[in-house]
């Protein structure tokens, strides 16, 4: 008995006439007056289910096959034949059906054939992978993550596992989840009435990380080229389609690199990942183009064939001020560009992905390298047509005196960053890196606009089920 995935059958990896066994779940059952049933069986290996043609001569045809409904799990054995119908190249002439799991009450099964709204599916996150849309998102997400790992491996990067529990605030934003084992009903107090974190598990305040960057820099300053790829956390009370409390970040860090170097790295990585999806997951992309966003395939093809534009923040502000468009948020030098500004630049002005660089220092983090003008830092955002900002990065401040000045300006205690400052004391080196919000990337590739639908179990304000 040869076990086959549905994808391997459709790819022609098994000869016509050979017998294979497919294990999966029933999507639909259709019965013919000619005494045969058609089972659509999917196993998640590709978008389309395979059709099994089941004759009534099977001994369990009446008492089992005719009772199969959407969601039942089955093991189906049959001969691969060329399909006479349109839509798929092969089907199975079934010789054996084993039912491994029934759906208790088909009338109340939440994932029955009828279509559900994407909002309703969020309430059923444990079952939604069974739907066409979430299954397709999962395969594209996997393809993108595998491609990103391949890209960095092929380019000589070392993958570093940075800690999820930290004592430092990388962004200086303060919106962090506290990690504590203290009894909330009976908190220990210091003499001045504050919570005594000396009595806590780590002997100090600890938080879930907002970024692996600072830890990543320590390894880049020894191994030259590293990247992190893992979960990060923001206790930002934003209930929007663009925010999650827990999400994944890709963060490369490169020693002896400038802002220009990492802009090129970002372009190379994105194009590599998009090429992989176009090559490997066209079945899923066709579904998204048909049911979610008709431009997804064309958008990715255009992205990989376009050269990235580059513009200084100061020039971008001037472009926005002179374009004649009335924005919801007025543009002036010193503001952080909003999504409408970013999308205008990428979609209407440059009509290509664009790198905006050299932002005002007052709207950027303490670790970004101060430029010679004393007003801007060597920071960049990569803006993509259709979504806006997809990557944010910078050259890091490698000069200890300037770093200390920036920490002071932002009211951050330099003693908390003693180990980060050590990197500047012992063989300091220019270095640079960026962060890619992985869910935002998946959203861009699939056209699925709400970021809560591109991560298996979304975590957001008042949302931590499953």
Swiss-Prot record:
GO molecular function: asparagine-tRNA ligase activity; ATP binding; nucleic acid binding
CDD domains hit by this protein: AsxRS_core, EcAsnRS_like_N
PROSITE patterns the UniProt entry points to: AA_TRNA_LIGASE_II
InterPro entries xrefs: Aa-tRNA-synt_II, aa-tRNA-synth_II, aa-tRNA-synth_II/BPL/LPL, Asn-tRNA-ligase, Asp/Asn-tRNA-synth_IIb, NA-bd_OB-fold, NA-bd_OB_tRNA
Record carries keyword Transport: no
This enzyme's EC code(s): 6.1.1.22
Cellular component terms (Gene Ontology): cytoplasm
Reaction catalysed by this enzyme: tRNA(Asn) + L-asparagine + ATP = L-asparaginyl-tRNA(Asn) + AMP + diphosphate + H(+)
Pfam families: tRNA-synt_2 (PF00152), tRNA_anti-codon (PF01336)
Subcellular localization, as worded in the UniProt entry: Cytoplasm
Organism superkingdom: Bacteria
NCBIfam families: asnS (TIGR00457), PRK03932.1 (NF003037)
Description of how the protein assembles with itself and partners: Homodimer.
Listed name of the protein: Asparagine--tRNA ligase
């Amino acid at each position: 008995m040869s076990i086959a995935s549905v994808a391997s059958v459709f790819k022609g990896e098994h000869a016509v006439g050979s017998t294979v066994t497919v294990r999966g779940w029933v999507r639909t059952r259709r019965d013919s007056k000619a005494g045969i049933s058609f089972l659509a069986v999917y196993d998640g290996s590709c978008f389309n289910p395979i059709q099994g043609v089941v004759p009534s001569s099977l001994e369990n045809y009446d008492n089992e096959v005719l009772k199969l409904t959407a969601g039942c799990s089955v093991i189906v054995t049959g001969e691969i034949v060329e399909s006479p119908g349109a839509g798929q190249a092969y089907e199975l002439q079934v010789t054996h059906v084993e039912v491994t799991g029934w759906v208790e009450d088909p009338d109340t099964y939440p994932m029955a054939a009828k279509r559900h709204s994407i909002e309703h599916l969020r309430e059923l996150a444990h079952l939604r992978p069974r739907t066409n849309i979430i299954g397709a998102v999962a395969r594209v997400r996997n393809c993108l993550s595998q491609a990103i790992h391949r890209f960095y491996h092929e380019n000589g990067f070392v993958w570093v596992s940075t800690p999820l529990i930290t004592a430092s605030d990388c962004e200086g934003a303060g919106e962090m989840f506290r990690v504590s084992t203290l009894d909330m009903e009976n908190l220990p107090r210091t003499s001045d009435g504050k919570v005594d974190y000396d009595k806590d598990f780590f002997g100090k305040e600890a938080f879930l990380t907002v970024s692996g960057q600072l830890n990543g820099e320590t390894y880049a300053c020894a191994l030259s080229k590293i990247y992190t790829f893992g979960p990060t956390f923001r206790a930002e009370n934003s209930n929007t389609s663009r925010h999650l409390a827990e999400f994944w970040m890709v963060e490369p860090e490169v020693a002896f690199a400038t802002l220009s170097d990492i802009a090129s790295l970002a372009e190379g990585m994105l194009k590599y990942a998009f090429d992989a999806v176009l090559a490997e997951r066209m079945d899923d992309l066709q579904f998204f183009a048909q049911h979610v966003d008709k431009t997804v395939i064309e958008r990715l093809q255009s992205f990989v064939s376009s050269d990235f534009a580059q513009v200084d923040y100061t020039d971008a502000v001037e472009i926005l001020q002179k374009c004649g468009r009335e924005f919801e948020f007025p543009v002036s030098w010193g503001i952080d560009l909003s999504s409408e500004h970013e999308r205008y630049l990428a979609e209407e002005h440059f009509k290509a992905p664009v790198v905006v660089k050299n932002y005002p220092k007052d709207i950027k983090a303490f670790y970004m390298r101060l430029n010679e003008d004393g007003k801007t830092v060597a920071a960049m955002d990569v803006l993509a047509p259709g979504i806006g900002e997809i990557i944010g990065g910078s050259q890091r401040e490698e000069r200890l005196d300037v770093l200390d000045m920036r920490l002071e300006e932002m009211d951050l205690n330099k003693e908390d960053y003693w180990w980060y400052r050590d990197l500047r004391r012992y063989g300091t080196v220019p270095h640079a890196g960026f962060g890619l919000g992985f869910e935002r990337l998946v959203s861009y590739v699939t056209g699925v606009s709400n970021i809560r639908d591109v991560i298996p179990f979304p975590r957001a304000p008042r949302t931590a089920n499953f």
